[in-house]
């Protein structure tokens, strides 16, 4: 990603792997990871029963720059809604319900702490 150091990219990728494991353990069925188009990226797309979950993953080693969930601004939420509509259109996927989740990953020593906020926005 432009503007991100290799270290930050590595931390983010690790956080996404932690989030994916969490979702699978919770019974969700991932269908896409790091889906990209010219307008942005969706970290994880997964089925939670009949509900399609669009998942944004935020990973932090410290809260110096705010909590992971605070990084999901209104602007980011609007972009994710547009990206989800585009993914649905491009893949021809039909979903009666689409939910937007945020997975907050904190890496503060010891095992990662994963918080899954279903329907975050």
From Swiss-Prot:
Database matches in SUPFAM superfamilies: Restriction endonuclease-like
Name under which the protein is recorded: UPF0102 protein Strop_1320
HAMAP family xref list: UPF0102 (MF_00048)
Molecular function as annotated in GO: nucleic acid binding
Family the entry assigns: Belongs to the UPF0102 family.
Lineage: Bacteria, Bacillati, Actinomycetota, Actinomycetes, Micromonosporales
Transmembrane regions: none
Entry superkingdom: Bacteria
